[in-house]
Amino acid sequence: MPNIFLSNYIFIFILLTNKFLKTFDYVESKHWNNICLKDLYDKNDIKLNKTNKLKLKYKNFMFSDLKKQKKRKETETATGTITQKQKHTKKKKLHGQTNGYFIKRNKIQHIFANIPYNNNFKKINQDIYTFKNVNYHPKNANKKVYLKINNATHLETIKTYITKCIKNYRHQNEEKTQKKIRNYNNIIQYYVSRKNNNNNNNNRFIHTYNMLFINIFYNIISKNRNEKKKKNRKTDFQKYLRKYEELYQKFTPENDAENNDINNDKNNSDLISQINKKNISNIIINEWCLRNNNEKYNSTLMYDYISNMHNTEYQDITCVNNFIKNNEMIEKETWEHKQKPYLTYKYEFKYRDPINRKNKLYQYEYYIPKLITYEEDISTEPKFVPSNFKSPKCYNNSPVNALTTSGFSSRNIDTFGKERNKIYSFNTPTDVKRNIFFDDLILISSSYNQHFFPNLNFLLNLHTLQILIRDKTAIETDYMIDKFDQLKEKLIQINSPHVIDNNQNDDIDNNNNNNNNNNNCDNPYNKRIIPINNKSTNNDACTIDNISNIQHRKNQTNDQNNKSKDDEINEEISSNLTYKKTLFDDKIQLFKNKYDKNILDDKDFVQLWKYNEKGEIVETINKIPIPKIYLNIDDPKYLSWKILQNSGKTAFKEIPTPNRKLEAWRQQVNLKTFYKQNFDSSISLRNISKEELVDYKMKIVDNTFEKNEKVQNDISDHFDNIKMDNQQNEEKVELNENINYYNSDNINGDNINGDNINGDNINGDNINGDNINGDNINGDNINGDNINGDNINGDNINGDNINDDNINDDNINDVNNNHNNNHNSDNHYYYGDTHKINNQNKKNVNETINISENTNMDDNNNNEIYSQNYKEQRIKNQDISNNAYNFNKEHIDKCKRKYKKAFYTLVVRDGIVDEYLSDDINILKNLDNKLKKKSEINQNKENENENENNSQSDNNTTKQHIQDEQGTEQKKSKIFVGSFFNVKDVEIEYLINKELYFIPEHSNWYKTNTQPFIRGQIGKQSRKFDNDYPIYDYRKSDFGMAKFSSLNLASIKDCAVVYLDENIDLSDKFIHVIFIATSKNEDIDNNNNNNDNNNDNDIYEKQSKYNVYENIPSNNKQTNSNNNSEYNNEQNNCSNKQITNDEQNDNEYEKEESIQKCHMEKVISSHDDTIQNCDIEKNECKENKKSKYTQIKLTEYHTHNPITNPRLVVYVKGNSKINIYESHISLNKSNSGLVNGFSRICLEEKSNVKHTLSQELGNNVWHFHNVSVKNGLNANYKFVDVLLGSLSSRINLQIEGEKGCKQESYGLSLLEDKQNISQYEMFHHEHPSMETNQLFKCLVSDKAHAVWRSRGRIERNAIKAKLNTLCKSILLNFGASAVCIPTLEIIPSDIECANHGATISDLEKEPIFSLMTRGISERNAREIMMNSFVKEILDHISDENLKNRVYQKVLKFSQKYKSSTY
């Protein structure tokens, strides 16, 4: 048999022996006691007898029976029967003898120490066990000493000796060894101590030996071989031992904590507690490898450890250096020696100095190989892949597909467009496949995406929460998350009043003991710590007094546990929970001390808030929303928030990665720019005022004006009579003397307070008052052109005729306001800028408003005259006031233009609900109270009818139930709009919590036979079965967007919630939800404008930069010649400048200036050249005439690209109606980043929802949005979206309904420049009599690209279905492109209608020509055509501001067009 096979068999034989691999777990600490300790825990139950003879795998040299040890010493000293010969013979039987030194080891050490590697066997053993420096201190006994073993020559002798050793172990008696080793922790300590005792040396130096197994086998095999065989042997053998060789071969850290000698007088419990302590080194393998500069550490195994950066804080420069050196992809010197191009990544790392507590920047750089570009045809056809993986066309079977760790793996990324054949390495990870230097990249393929694309590392590690602290994630316990539902009932029982009363006395005793401990210890948080286990209490003991107190506590806890032995379940719960809670709270308090009571780590956020010790907000300095959950870990909502994040992380792992080719074909977008961006969490911290959001808020036409057009003729007949009444009322000014004070052109008053103000005529052109407070303000005619009041508070305001041109009220608070025309106080009206009228051309519009029917009249003499006039005028105008407003014919068009705001606007800033920017909550509270009163009235009526039918005996019982139900219903809220963390009702929280976990195409897998098909041709077979849903097939489902939605859930900060109860009609009102995406680019723009005013603010500091440079080899001669030529050209330019200046300017003063300038330029250029030449000469000497590399700057990342994850949940109960308007905006058009949105909408039976969505983000923003709808029985859902902004936007709409439901979808997208907007729609018909109507339109200009795909699936049970889909897209110029793909999948035959279509065309020429014949220019004619094309979608939108923005963008398209001749 050849020697090569022998070596392999020996290696496998040793691997199969027990506990061989276990040793590698403890090599890191280099403490062999841990090997024995692990066996001790597993074999505590085994009791050894004298007759038992253990095998090799059960052999153990550690034993902790101290009682027998004492007896043995006493017997030996008393009798002295044991002689030296008997001892000598026993040791021979056990282990053998070598020159008087007795070898005694673990079973693995025993084998390898006794192997006769050479003929000089005795000398080897003497070298091993002879120790130097015997006079060392005993504490240094655990220092490491390497074995020095000579190389073996004969392999056959090794085999024979191993078999002999195994046979000897079977016949050994273990009790004899135990009696001799009881006093020592290790076998080696025993024999070394005996030698020291024989030599009369009291100082003991204990050796612990480190067996380098890999070096042993490597030396055994490689010796006495030829050089050729040695090379082959090394390559073959390193395949088996590569991991161990890199990680464990040279790792020898020193343990900081060292075990002291164990005293014989200690108890068994103390000994066990010391055995349980494992001496694990604080040194990391990476740090140790960096200290030893012999060989650089470039293995790929530790990159997974490095990828978890977000769990640690790199605040020191040394840690940053370690991270940089571990991430160096290539060695610069070796790469330059090969004359290959490479890239340098320079990054300025921002860290915090722990001493000064200031943010500083530290620049570092690392090197990455540059891949060579080439031309290749990218298509979806399969290609032949060779087995060597060295060809550039390596697609499917590339090892990079298996080694990449990112979710966006190389399988789902591809590029399209003109530049698809020229791609750099740092743009897309698919370039690994197109590399000539493929063998060099195998070394870095495991962490390729992490280092080439920091944004992918950022997405996968879910580092999107800037507010959340990293330390909190380390503190959280999975125990509370897993056992929350199971222990909920038991906790209620434990916290019941009976149990609390019994435990009050015990708590008082514990508090007294804790107070005593605080006087002795430095830890101020020992009050809350209740030690339960000996392990936790023995760790931190300050003084002897503390130890006595701890023992006193143990006795108390044991007494309490003895009392509760009846209920074992309660005992387990109480012990586990109290243990976890005390440690958890203690760590939180230490965490607060670490940051000096500042909860947040980021300096910017710390300056914005003030806290208590509890973490509660005291005072807000800035208007930036931060939920209290991030500050209070004890909040019950904190647990639910962490569960949401963990469920998103698990879903992200479970969702399969889609196929590269299929996803690229579906996406139809060049993803190169997406992977080129460096995403971060750089959101803006500036104050956003409400005035900035005025243009983006809703502007709705009031429908009451349209209804009054029918009554215009009746109003005109009564207008003359009203005018006469006004003239009569003007003559009655003398009735009240106090009114004369108010008859003036300009009345300015800050505070006007009057209990009773009675006036028939109040005439004022300008009345300006900040605060007008009056209990009773009675006036027949109040005429004012401009009345401006900030705060007008009045209990009763009675006026028959109020005539004014412009009334601007910021805040109007009325206690009793009863409008006959059904106008609520929540709706505030405002006028546009076009309605301003000059003082010269004033026109009175008579508006008769009957504000209140019940008037509060005082007992005054003047009021009697007023009451008579009031009654006469009321009778005349009673019929008119009940029907509608009185309008003048000249101002009917003006009244139609009056608008109203949305009922309530909710603002979400960077994924967090902002209560400051949103409207007042009292608006919702007032509406909630009104709805509750209506529901009570309706219930009382129903109950009365039921009680009449029932008997008197039954009435008593029913009344009690009715009262209880009413009491619960009053607590329930009928409407809720706000943050999920502010929900207080249990029912609302339960319903919305279900919908938060929903992820499209992942949560739907609960259906039968809907598992996704990832490989093979299973997708075709799924069509044969009715129960299978091909919608979730691998070829049809969109797993890429499912990953984005799971990422949104994993990085959730807050959630906007809209809830509506049953039987509520809010079809007249709109709820507007605004999602703002900010960036620090806005802060930079504001700072440039306000540098003089804001010099003291430290919030806006220098941010990190990220640059990429390309290094290309070049010849030295060319560079030198180019430098000299540039230097000569500069001199010539200076001389030419001097000549021209002499000719033009004859003044001597100007000549001297020009000469001085040129002289200075020459000096500077010559100085720079000398420095460059010196550097070149030095580099030439060092590099030994190697090629020089020129550096070219490729990219520069100064812009900030934040990631925001907005989330919306809408839940509408049965028989209710509501209008929701969702808008995504960015206040600065130059913003960039990623907006990953998700909205979930649920409808119950017979509900109606109108949902509009507008997207107006920055020009460089990537927008991905999932909209999932669950339509109810006989419910109606209408979806309208308008897409205007962003660089690339994609919207997925998925609707699933029930029987008799109806859904409508209307969309519009306007594209310009290089925008890419795509919309994907899915309508799934699973139940009968469902109806869908869909229409989408596109206007594409410049080089933009539009994508539309719809899919309608009708299952077998969905009978009598209606489905209509249509897309119309218009290309305005050459270079624009569009893709429209409608699909239908129909299984049943009983269908009423199913249509689909798509058109892509230019603007029609015939209607444009017909408009031009009527004198209209070509641009205006095209604008008219585009407006008519867009109007069909805009008719479904009620926001006038959004319509105006659409028309403005259409006007841009028309102006870009160049005229042409027909």
UniProtKB/Swiss-Prot annotation:
Entry protein name: Iron-sulfur cluster assembly protein SufD
Subcellular location per the Swiss-Prot or TrEMBL entry: Plastid, Apicoplast
Segments of this protein annotated with the region Disordered: 500-525, 938-970, 1111-1153
Family indicated by similarity: Belongs to the iron-sulfur cluster assembly SufBD family.
UniProt record, GO biological process: iron-sulfur cluster assembly
InterPro entries reported for this sequence: Fe-S_cluster_assembly_SufBD (IPR055346), SUF_FeS_clus_asmbl_SufBD_core (IPR000825), SUF_FeS_clus_asmbl_SufBD_sf (IPR037284)
Molecular function terms, GO-annotated: 4 iron, 4 sulfur cluster binding; metal ion binding
Subunit (UniProt): Component of a complex composed of SufB, SufC and SufD in a stoichiometric ratio of 1:2:1. Interacts with SufB. Interacts with SufC; the interaction enhances the ATPase activity of SufC.
Species whose genome carries this gene: Plasmodium falciparum (isolate 3D7)
Pathway: Cofactor biosynthesis; iron-sulfur cluster biosynthesis
